[in-house]
Amino acid sequence: MRILGIETSCDETGVAIYDEEKGLVANQLYSQIEMHADYGGVVPELASRDHIRKTLPLIQEALKEANLTAADIDGVVYTAGPGLVGALLVGSTIARSLAYAWNVPALGVHHMEGHLMAPMLEDNPPAFPFVALLISGGHTQLVKVEGVGQYEILGESIDDAAGEAFDKTGKLLGLDYPAGVAVSQLAEKGTPNRFVFPRPMTDRPGLDFSFSGLKTFAANTINANLDENGRLDEQTRCDIAHAFQQAVVDTIIIKCKRALQQTGYKRLVMAGGVSANKQLRTDLAEMMKNLKGEVYYPRPQFCTDNGAMIAYTGFLRLKNGETSDLSISVKPRWNMTELPDISTTGG
């Protein structure tokens, strides 16, 4: 079985082909970051238009990369949500049109389930069950995972996601969008403990997150350290970035440890754009070593949005016999716990 996967939920156009016998045989990705940087964030209308321009050429490139033709494809899957409705509709419309033309099944895939399954593409994939930390620009969730489709949300952000907090704080520090990587680069040059940020919601029970207060704390710290010209010196910028990042990482570490203790699990899977953060990876690895557990995450190229994770996740569900009709429907808001459980039905 060979599955074509299409990802268009936000500002990356991803197309990939997953082969049941050979694994991932094609992976094409186009990022719109440069286009949106001028606006300081993703412009939904521009994102949709760019997906229209890029998706079909990327499909052609993916087929070429895999040395396949349309006749070799056994199913088409696409991101149906969550995400920007216009962007989702582009991928959905193209995917379903191709499925109809090629007379193969089509299926909408949950974007965050795709992220959750991304580590399965690695040579040493995690075994079930595990706790998953899904951490991106739009989501921060801790999920109890017992199998494909067996999900329980243990905790999530009640306001800004971690990636969103990085971008907003980066903007306050004068960094261009998207600012997450740039904040981390500044943080590497920061002086530890010059500034101490709070660790939100760690002084009470529970596994929910809150990151919006850190942005406010950063703004107040910046304003309190401006020189007579209203500017921050470079070292102070680095020190604030360091304090902010350490607060986010420490908060995540505390919540992950609680989730593992609550479930009794020894495996932690981390996925999503922020999972590429070096400090977070280092500190999580240290925590899991102390707990005598294991941490898994995808290679950096599969941390951000991509077609590979969608193709693989769709493959799992199509192989299980799950399909949907050819109506064009997307779900900008979609709870992962609503997904069918295929863990005990041969998937």
Swiss-Prot record:
GO terms for biological process: tRNA threonylcarbamoyladenosine modification. It catalyses: L-threonylcarbamoyladenylate + adenosine(37) in tRNA = N(6)-L-threonylcarbamoyladenosine(37) in tRNA + AMP + H(+). PROSITE patterns: GLYCOPROTEASE. It is found in: Cytoplasm. Its cofactor is Fe(2+). It comes from the Bacteria. Keywords: Acyltransferase, Cytoplasm, Iron, Metal-binding, Transferase, tRNA processing. Pfam families: TsaD (PF00814). GO terms for molecular function: iron ion binding; N(6)-L-threonylcarbamoyladenine synthase activity. GO terms for cellular component: cytoplasm. Signal peptide: none annotated. Substrate binds at L134, I135, S136, G137, G138, D167, G180, N277. Its EC number is 2.3.1.234. InterPro entries: ATPase_NBD, Gcp-like_dom, KAE1/TsaD, Peptidase_M22_CS, TsaD. Fe cation binds at H111, H115, D305. Binds 1 Fe(2+) ion per subunit. Belongs to the KAE1 / TsaD family. PANTHER family: TRNA N6-ADENOSINE THREONYLCARBAMOYLTRANSFERASE, TRNA N6-ADENOSINE THREONYLCARBAMOYLTRANSFERASE, MITOCHONDRIAL. Required for the formation of a threonylcarbamoyl group on adenosine at position 37 (t(6)A37) in tRNAs that read codons beginning with adenine. Is involved in the transfer of the threonylcarbamoyl moiety of threonylcarbamoyl-AMP (TC-AMP) to the N6 group of A37, together with TsaE and TsaB. TsaD likely plays a direct catalytic role in this reaction. HAMAP family: TsaD (MF_01445). This is tRNA N6-adenosine threonylcarbamoyltransferase. It comes from Actinobacillus pleuropneumoniae serotype 5b (strain L20). The lineage of its organism: Bacteria, Pseudomonadati, Pseudomonadota, Gammaproteobacteria, Pasteurellales. The gene is tsaD.
